[in-house]
Amino acid sequence: MNQKAVQKINYAYLLLTIFVPLVLIGVMGYIGATFFREGGTGAVICFMLPTALAVVWWIFGPTTIWRLRKKAMEQQLDQQGFTRNQTFYGSNHTVIVDIRKGMIALLFFWNPFVSFILPASRVTKAWTDDGAAGSGFLRGTSRVSFLFLIDGIKIRVDTFTSNQRWKMNDEHVLTGISKADMWVQVLAEAKEASELRDGTH
């Protein structure tokens, strides 16, 4: 069990992910300009290869790490006897709940090397945000989420997102709201089970 406060972002990891490729481009560019002033294959390698590798890293690196770390966390949970009753794979969060034991496991995209396995009693509030905006026939949403507070930190997990506004009675929106409501209920049940185990309920 992780007793540390939840941390959604590891800023060292975030900065390394962004800036290490830039440093590589700068260093190799300097080498190319210094030692291959007349061009040629060496200059092409120094200028083009690091840029290509950086782009590939930015596109695939963090997402590959994220995917591998999710699998590693699931294996860790299984080894610990954590029953994965409900799992939600968000773009930036993974939330897994063992309802009977009242436990929650969290993994964050920008802090992928630390999995937080916590008693659900640390959740102080959980709710659905349908993202509704506008009025009349313009009323709609482009984002539906369930949110919860744990250790005073707000965690938002999207169940529906779009780059345009959808009407509130649209099937996709209603499905997103239904998923969010279900997760609020799951968190409430896990919290109750956790408090019963702790003798605080």
Across the structure, where does each feature detected by a protein language model lie?
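Anionic N-terminal interaction surfaces
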Residues: 2-7, 39-103
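Juxtamembrane interface helix immediately N-terminal to a transmembrane segment
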Residues: 2-23
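Hydrophobic alpha-helical transmembrane segments of multipass integral membrane proteins
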Residues: 21-28, 51-55
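Juxtamembrane "helix-exit" motif on the non-cytosolic side of transmembrane helices
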Residues: 27-38
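Short secondary-structure junctions
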Residues: 78-87, 125-128, 132, 198
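Glycine-centered tight beta-turn/hairpin loop motif at sheet-sheet or coil-to-beta transitions
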Residues: 92, 111-113, 150-154
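Acidic, Ser/Thr- and proline-rich intrinsically disordered linker/docking segments
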Residues: 127-201
